[in-house]
């Protein structure tokens, strides 16, 4: 293969962005210039969502207005609730999220308006409704009644309430909120580039986010947090961890939750999420997954010099919170809607159709024979 061909667009800079910057050389990630770790420390997810969408952190009045608009748009139409009830219970929640957002596009009165103002309003509506749709399916597939959203709860609290009927301890809510902040945006990743590619054809925001969700479902992208939990469940006990991971490496198996296309010496989001993973484990009085985590991480670094990515601590954290494993990536969706929406609006602002080239390696020109001659 020619050196001119960059499989996976490796190392290719395709555009500029103001939304976020990944700096692997100093192990840092910033949203609009603010370090993600600092945002986790001093802000709640709603503030970060506002920042990503509006380019600056909100003041008290701006945040109150943003939160009011989000809360007023949480409930779903009767038709969408009905459709979710009819979805097969075995459906993967990512497929439910993708379908729900697509239907939101059918129902939205501003679907054909792609002005920045309309896209901002639609982004907030998608952010508000997607957790409700996912929580509704979470309960339906368990044979339970849907719990409607409450306006006196923030996004993190409300999702717990709609899924479980109650809001957990504030430390667990904070850990969930931190995960939303860390998952909110990450430059030109696969799903974001998918959203921008769709947008470049002047398609609508619902279509672009639907495509992004489909991209995020893959285990090499968002689905990795689910695979991490499947791996830990296979290991079962800290006593098995050392043997399991060494055996996996000896067989040259892929160990999910490790490595990153950009970060080579460690994902900048991991230390923060690891800290909150420990806090949740302490509250739940369950150290098993923490012990497995540490053993597997040490072997991966010692033997392969491969560090964990943010999916590695997030998977067991969500598990300890009580979420089903196949809901881990849909939670990622709830958060990343903000990043996708910001990139969609940025693409619209200076658009050029994304149309790369391919080097043909198939047959040369061939003569077509009629059917009776073949």
Residue ranges and their predicted role:
Residues 1-374:
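Non-transmembrane, aqueous-exposed alpha-helical and coiled segments at domain scale
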């Amino acid at each position: 293969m020619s050196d001119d061909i960059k499989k996976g667009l490796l190392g290719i800079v395709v555009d500029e962005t103001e939304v976020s910057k990944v700096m692997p050389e100093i192990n840092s990630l910033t949203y609009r210039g603010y370090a993600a770790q600092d945002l986790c420390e001093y802000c709640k997810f709603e503030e970060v969502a506002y920042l990503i969408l509006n380019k600056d952190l909100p003041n008290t009045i701006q945040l109150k207005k943003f939160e009011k608009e989000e809360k007023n748009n949480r409930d779903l139409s009767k038709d969408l609730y009905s459709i979710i009830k009819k979805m097969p219970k075995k459906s993967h929640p990512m497929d439910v999220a993708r379908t729900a957002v697509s239907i939101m596009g059918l129902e939205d009165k501003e679907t054909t308006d792609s002005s920045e103002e309309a896209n901002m309003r639609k982004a907030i509506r998608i952010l508000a409704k997607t957790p409700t749709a996912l929580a509704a399916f979470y309960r339906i597939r368990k044979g339970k009644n849907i719990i409607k959203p409450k306006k006196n709860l923030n996004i993190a609290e409300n999702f717990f309430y709609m899924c479980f009927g109650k809001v957990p301890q504030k430390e667990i809510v904070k850990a969930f909120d931190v995960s939303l902040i860390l998952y909110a945006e990450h430059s030109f990743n696969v799903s974001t580039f998918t959203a921008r590619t769709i947008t470049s054809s002047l398609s609508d925001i619902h279509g672009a986010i639907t495509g992004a969700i489909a991209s995020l479902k893959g285990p090499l992208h968002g689905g990795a947090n689910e695979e991490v939990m499947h791996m830990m469940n296979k290991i079962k006990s800290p006593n098995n961890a050392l043997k399991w991971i060494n055996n996996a490496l000896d067989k040259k198996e892929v160990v999910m939750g490790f490595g990153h296309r950009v970060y080579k010496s460690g994902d900048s989001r991991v230390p923060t999420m690891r800290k909150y993973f420990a806090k949740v484990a302490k509250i739940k009085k369950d150290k098993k997954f923490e012990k497995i985590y540490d053993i597997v991480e040490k072997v991966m670094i010692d033997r392969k010099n491969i560090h964990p990515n943010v999916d590695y601590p997030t998977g067991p954290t969500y598990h300890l919170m009580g979420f089903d494993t196949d809901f881990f990536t849909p939670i990622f969706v709830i958060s990343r809607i903000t990043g996708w929406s910001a990139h969609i609006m940025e693409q619209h602002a200076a658009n050029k159709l994304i149309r790369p080239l391919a080097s043909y390696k198939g047959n040369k020109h061939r003569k077509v024979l009629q059917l009776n001659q073949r």
